[in-house]
C-alpha cells in the first residue's frame, strides 16, 4: 500500500509532500488514520528553542546578517518599507507562507529599481546581477531565488538553502543548528557530528511527528485494531482523504457492506 501525505497536515510548519510504501503479509491491507492537525506557527516554533550557551548546536548556520548582507532584503526594508527593522517587517506580514525577498520585490517593485539603488549605494556588481534578473523576468525566464526566507506561519520544504537562509523572527540573524533541527522535530538532546559539514543531514530525515504517525498506525495493525481492506494494492491519500483500490474492491461502499 501507499500512504500519501504532507508534513503540514501532521502539525509541522513546513509544506513537504511525503509518500510511504508498505508491504503487508496476506491479502488484506490496513486502513490508516487521516491527519489534519493545526500546524505549529513557524515563528513560535523558532522562539521556543532554548538558547543555551553550553549547547554545541547553539551556533549559527550562517554568520551573515540578513538586513545587511542580503541586498534584496535590505532594499525591501529601506526602500519599499521606508526604513523599518527586520523585527518590524516580520510583525507586518500577513498570516501564511514565509516570504522570499525576491518574490516580494517582484510583487511590490522590480529589479531595475533594485539595480539603481544598488549602483547608487556603490555596489555595481550586485546591480548588474539585478538587471540580469530583470531581463530574465521580462523574457519569461525563471530565477534561482536563494535569498533569505522570512518566517511567517509556515515555509516550504525545509531542504536545500533554507537551513542557512531562514531568519529568526525577532533577531536580525539566521538560524542556529538547534533551531534548524527543530523544523524536523529532532530531539533537543541530539547533536549532529560536524554540523557545518553535515548540515544537510537535518533535511534528509522524515520529521519526527510524521514518522511517529506512521509508526502508530503500524502498531495498530500489529495489535489488530485497524480496519482492513481486502485488496492487492491500495493508495490512501491523506491530502484528499480518498482511497484508490484495485481489483478486489470496486468501491469503499462495497467494502463497508
Regions found by a protein language model. Give the residues of each.
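Class I S-adenosyl-L-methionine
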Residues: 1-138
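C-terminal target-recognition/interaction regions appended to catalytic cores
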Residues: 86-257
